[in-house]
Swiss-Prot record:
Family classification: Belongs to the acetaldehyde dehydrogenase family.
Protein's recorded name: Acetaldehyde dehydrogenase 1
Short name of one Pfam family: AcetDehyd-dimer
One GO BP annotation of this record: catabolic process
Alphabetical keyword list: Aromatic hydrocarbons catabolism, NAD, Oxidoreductase
Active-site feature positions: 130
Length: 303
């Protein structure tokens, strides 16, 4: 089976967890890991796994893209550098899967809108945020039944699972997630809150979703829609679980979720890594299947 060669940019918590997911993929083959700190644990792990590595940032990868056949790159760095990384790699015809909150490309939340990205020839798609991937399916499950005037999500993650890149991007995280609650989730107005909990031992990722419907909620249909959506998410994140709900209070629908990871890099409490990396891998696999079938051709975007 032919595999599409990939590069990972950013050997932090997300990049390292993603590497483990890609190594199991039937259609993706990770060949490069890009960092900026020669001593980083993530670069060492990637080298030990047989990947080529550079500590010179994306500029250290560019000369090797063509020779090594890299067609897809995952950016798990920071919103501040993503636009430049994307521009340089798009110019070489490499498609970007953006795991930062930069959101210069269209949002992708696989169980909600993955299929809509088929055949669109996009060279950059954005995976929103871990909080977005965990909660937007629930907002969408409600909005697919009836209009949602307001959607609010609260993502609680363990301090240990939140690396320096994510911490620098907190404002971008809340803005990007709120925007995707509207654009992908279907809420007229969206709001996002992230809580980084320093408790030891670290807590599992918890997510609370509140929706205010325009009309009186159709409880049976909303409940069925939520359970159906949970099954869709569980196809790629088995540890995605409903803890409580849906709870109905007037026009408010509340859902309380928990996300357990596979423990590929950080232990299972870090479900926030898994929901992001599994969604990114799932998205890239769809594009890789198109590339292998010859129905998608990547074209360089002039810088």
């Amino acid at each position: 089976m032919k595999k599409i060669k990939c590069a990972l940019i950013g050997p932090g918590n997300i990049g390292t967890d993603l590497l483990a997911k890609l190594q199991r993929s039937p259609v993706l083959e990770p060949v490069w890991m890009v960092g900026i700190d020669p001593g980083s644990d993530g670069l060492k792990r990637a080298r030990d796994a047989g990947l080529k590595t550079t500590a010179e940032g994306v500029d250290g990868l560019l000369p090797h893209v063509k020779a090594d056949g890299v067609q897809i790159a995952f950016d798990a760095t920071s919103a501040y550098v993503h636009a430049e990384n994307s521009r340089k790699l798009n110019a070489l015809g490499v498609m970007m899967i953006d795991l930062t909150p930069a959101a210069i490309g269209p949002f992708c939340v696989p169980p909600v809108n993955l299929k809509q990205h088929l055949g669109r020839r996009e060279m950059n798609v954005n995976m929103v945020t871990c909080g977005g991937q965990a909660t937007i399916p629930m907002v969408a499950a409600v909005s697919q039944v009836q209009a949602v005037a307001y959607g609010e999500i609260v993502a609680t993650v363990s301090s240990r699972s939140v690396g320096p890149g994510t911490r620098k991007n907190i404002d971008e995280f809340t803005r990007t997630t709120a925007g995707a609650v509207e654009k992908v989730g279907g809420a007229k107005k969206g709001k996002a809150i992230i809580i980084i909990n320093p408790a030891e031992p670290p807590l599992i990722m918890r997510d609370t979703v509140h929706c205010l419907t325009v009309d009186e909620p159709d409880r049976d249909r909303i409940t069925a829609s939520i359970h159906q959506m949970i099954r869709e998410v569980q196809k790629y994140v088995p540890g995605y679980k409903l803890v409580n709900g849906p709870v109905f209070d007037g026009k408010r629908v509340s859902v309380f979720m928990e996300v357990e990871g596979l423990g590929d890099y950080l232990p299972k409490y870090a479900g926030n890594l898994d929901i992001m990396t599994a969604a990114a891998a799932r998205t890239a696999e769809m594009f890789a299947e198109e590339l292998i079938a010859g129905t998608l051709k990547l074209e360089a975007v002039p810088a």
